[in-house]
A protein has these predicted regions:
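Short, surface-exposed structural microsegments at secondary-structure boundaries
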Residues: 1-137
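Eukaryotic C-terminal
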Residues: 2-4, 89, 104-116, 120-122, ...
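Alpha-helical scaffolding within the catalytic cores
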Residues: 139-142
């Protein structure tokens, strides 16, 4: 039976150190990195059972653990040279960092939520703050206040018509993540829920072309920025409905322009 081997560039070790570093740097691609924080109570010891009545567990015994289903970058698992180049070299433009360990150390309601002996305290996630997108999906964004200022690209999943999202989450985005450059919102009920959202809501002050809406994976995972999505949905509305029926459903200035075009066309016939 034929065997398959991975191509190997044997002269690579003989290249100059600078050239090898540049090659490692060129292997770096943007990733979407899933990050979440889970809270649990540790098992109660016998001494605690004797000293604490049932149902009166202290808040400061809660443990916050960092979780991610995203594997570490392959380059960092390749060899020592690649790992050192992409994490410590001063001339490499896109460096990976041990990130987000402070999320497990955040205090909650005035109590320290990590016990000193908890081994989970040392957990971290490799993240490139210049390229990677942090994907928090349905997690409360306030869990990320300790690191929000570092985040440039955010992905989350929400029901856009949900009252909590409209009144609270939208306002919180800019407060928790003040330095965002792009945001990716997975619309739980479908991408068309994003139609004209940037006209009504302020997503951390981002321009509409930097606000992306997505279908969930089970609906196809289609992604479009706000400008393109609005244009697509508007085109569909106009094709499927009479202009009279569209009044109030599309931007007023667009509706008036279309009505003028229709009137001019009728007069020219």
């Amino acid at each position: 039976m034929a065997t398959t081997t991975t191509p190997t560039f044997h002269p690579f070790p003989r290249l100059s150190f600078e050239l090898r570093n540049r090659i490692w740097e060129l292997t770096v691609d943007p990733r979407s990195v899933e990050v979440s924080v889970v809270t649990r109570y540790p098992k109660t010891t016998k001494s605690e059972l004797r000293n604490v009545q049932a149902g009166q567990r202290s808040h400061n015994s809660r443990l916050r653990h960092l979780r991610s289903s995203t594997a570490a970058p392959a380059q960092l698992q390749c060899c020592r040279e690649a790992r050192e180049c992409l994490t410590t070299h001063p001339k490499v433009g896109y460096l990976y960092s041990r990130a987000f360990s402070e999320l497990a150390q955040k205090t909650n309601q005035g109590f320290d939520t990590v016990l000193e002996h908890d081994p989970e305290l040392e957990r971290y996630i490799w993240f490139n703050f210049d390229l990677d997108t942090i994907s928090i999906e349905g997690t409360n964004m306030h869990e990320f206040e300790a690191v929000g200022y570092q985040i440039k690209r955010l992905r989350l999943e929400r029901v856009l018509d949900d009252e909590y999202f409209a009144r609270t989450d939208v306002r919180s985005i800019g407060k928790v993540f003040p330095n965002l450059r792009e945001i990716y919102i997975v619309c739980s009920l479908g991408i068309r829920d994003g139609y004209r959202r940037t006209e009504e809501d302020d997503y951390a002050g981002l321009a509409p072309e930097n606000v992306y809406f997505l279908d969930p994976e089970h609906l196809g995972g289609v992604m479009m920025n706000s400008v393109d999505l609005d244009a697509l949905v508007l085109e569909e509305y106009v094709a499927e409905n009479s202009l009279e029926d569209l009044e109030g459903c599309i931007p007023t200035e667009v509706w008036e322009e279309l009505m003028m075009q229709q009137t001019a066309g009728d007069q020219g016939q």
